[in-house]
Amino acid sequence: MPETFSASATRRRLRWPAAVAIGGALMMASGCADFAGEAAPNSWQPAPALSPEQPPNPVLPGQAGPSSSGDQGGRQGQNGTIPPPQGCQDFNPAVIATCLDAVSAVVALPGTDTDPIGLAAERTSGRIVRVHKGDPSQLQTTLQVDTSTADGGLTGLALSPTYTQDQLMFAYVTTATDNRVMLIAPGDTPKPILTGIPRGTTGNRGVLAVDHRGELLVATGDAGSPALATNPASLAGKVLRIDVDGQPAPDNPNPKSAIVASGLFEPGGVCSSTDGSQAWVTDRTPTEDVLYKLQLGRPLGVPAWTWPDQPGVAGCAAFSTSVMVATSTAGNVQSLALNKDGSFTGTPQISLQGPQGFGKLSGMDIIGDRGAMASTVNRDTGGTPVSSDDRVIIITSQPAGGGQD
């Protein structure tokens, strides 16, 4: 049976404060916790065919618009070629942190709209660091993690819905015996609030987000056993919805159960729109990558979008008119335009790939209604790191129709 730890935290059912809207274009830019310083794919399959709006075009700072071709440094800027990195110095204006271990997850801090500050989670080291352009990365805490599996470690990160008051954050980690959710409070030792999530040789990645009601969404891997994902007695391969104490959210369809959806394999990201209208989870199945719309009390059902070419879907950011997905195999950002009924049609707007991109991407978090923070994992297996990897970047969203001259 899973165990829970009671956290002493004041709860308020508030939406997260919007982090920021950065301009008009997606811009890339174990001890106690210390908070003192605070080629394009061509095989997509959509759900029902309607006529969508065009999604926003993700572009980098200094660019007039997106480009689908072009090196991992995002070298073409508005004013000419951007020099390649020199050691840990990266000249791309989208980059806000460099020379990290593979960054599995990022979160943007609330109240840093025009000058983003974030927290970055390193998968293999267990470190969580504060990142801000122009400042050295500041260690917040280090979690004990087991990295003997290919996909385990520190893989998920989320802030308390009342972070500006309590500075609490949550992390998803792999240990020698299980996967679990940790609560991290300023000046205190990280504590588990949900344990007993099955661990396997694969399928250990778990991801976190907070929904618009202030509850924690936890998407768990299947621990390498698809049967566990459909077993109602197991926490593997599920979407869980818990409160800050690790207990089932009281307004879950079954108030006594944390499970709100079943059938995941290797979730890459979970995200909720700031207006509370949509929540999504990405997943890598044996035959295709998928994006599911989360609806409490309903099965995952037919994916809202599928990628038979398996680009390695990872973190996501949900906007009112589109969903942006980072990929770690294809190494790009794919933006899907939402129809009014919540479905997608057309093909994804692909950007930040090849020479215009940053290589393998993993974590993503929304910043306001037009921006996102993302991370690279080029130092993970299969990556081709440059000297400044791994990095945290900022993306801003330009309305469709804008392009490079």
Task: Locate each region found by the language model.
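Sequence/structural signature of beta-propeller domains
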Residues: 2-19, 23-25, 33-405
